[in-house]
Amino acid sequence: MIKIYAPASIGNVGVGFDVLGAAISPIDNSLLGDVITITSSKQFSLTSTGTFSNQLPKDINKNIVKKCWTYFCKILKKNLPVSITLEKNMPIGSGLGSSACSIVATVVAINTFFNKPINNFELLKLMGKLEGKISGSVHYDNVAPSYLGGMQLIINKNDIVCQKISIFKNWLWVIAWPGISISTEQARTLLPLQYSKKVCIQHSQNLAGFIHATYTHQSKLASMFMHDIIAEPYRIKLLPYFLKTKQIIIDMGAIACGISGSGPAIFAVSDNLLTAKKIATWLTNYYLTNDRGFVHICKIDTIGARKIGL
C-alpha cells in the first residue's frame, strides 16, 4: 500500500502571475491537501472520500484521478490493476490548487507504487498537462510547488520546468477560503488579451524586485513588490468585497495581501504571530460566508508531496 499527501498551494503569490507558486502547510501541523491511497487489485477501482468528495463528478471517467491513471496506462503501454482511494480534503474552485493536489498525489502515488518508471521531469510535465485539462491551459504554478515544495519560479525552458527560490522563514501566510467556488477557467476569461507597455514594465519591475529581495534576504523590500496588476484588477469582479477586505487586513498590520490563484481564497502575509492571529480571527468572523469555509495560519511547505501513514 502507498499513501501520498500533496499540499495546497498559492498560485501567482500576487506578484508572479502564472510563474510563481508556493506550497503551504498549517502551523498547527494539520494536513491541508489531498491524500491518495493505492493498493493492489485485480482491476482498476476508484473510491472518493473526504470533506469535499461530494463536489467531484459523478461520472468516474470525468474524475481527474481516473484521467491520471489512464495517462499512466498509455505511457507504460499496459493496464495497471490498482485500487485507488482519493481523500478529497480541498474544495474545488477554491484558489488553493485543489486539482493540483489531486493530480500530484495521484501521479506520485502511481509512480511510486510501480517502482518509479517515470523520472521527476517527465512526472512534472505530465502534471502540468493534466492540470491544463481542467483549467484550460497548461501551467505549473500549483502542481510544481505541491510536488516539489517551497516557492517555485516557473521557467519552462529546455529541460527545466521550475526552480525553487529563497523564502522568508518568519513569514506567516494566513489563508482564508470563504466557502464558495470560482472556476479557474472562468476567472481566466476575465483577463485582457493584451496589456499596455506601462503595465508590462511595472509588472516586470515588481517580479524582478521580489525575486531579488528574496535572494538578498530583504523581507521588507520583498513585501513592497507584492502587487498584482495583471489579474487582480479584473478578478475583483468575482470578489466584490476583496478591496475593502484587503485594506482592513493591511491596516491590521499585514505586510501583503492578495488573491490566491483565481480565488476566492485570499492570503495575507505577516511577520509576527500575534498579527497573524488577529487577521485570522477577523477573516473567520467577516470573510467566511458559510460553515464550509476555513482559515489557516500557514508557513511555506518546503517538502511537497510525500508518503504519510505506514
Swiss-Prot record:
PROSITE patterns: GHMP_KINASES_ATP. It comes from the Bacteria. Its EC number is 2.7.1.39. One of its GO terms (biological process) is threonine biosynthetic process. ATP binds at residues 91-101. Keywords: Amino-acid biosynthesis, ATP-binding, Cytoplasm, Kinase, Nucleotide-binding, Threonine biosynthesis, Transferase. The keyword ATP-binding applies. GO terms for molecular function: ATP binding; homoserine kinase activity. The keyword Kinase applies. It catalyses: L-homoserine + ATP = O-phospho-L-homoserine + ADP + H(+). InterPro entries: GHMP_kinase_C_dom, GHMP_kinase_C_sf, GHMP_kinase_N_dom, GHMP_knse_ATP-bd_CS, Homoserine_kinase, Ribosomal_Su5_D2-typ_SF, Ribsml_uS5_D2-typ_fold_subgr. It is found in: Cytoplasm. One of its GO terms (cellular component) is cytoplasm. Disulfide bonds: none annotated. Belongs to the GHMP kinase family. Homoserine kinase subfamily. Catalyzes the ATP-dependent phosphorylation of L-homoserine to L-homoserine phosphate. HAMAP family: Homoser_kinase. This is Homoserine kinase. It comes from Buchnera aphidicola subsp. Baizongia pistaciae (strain Bp). The gene is thrB.
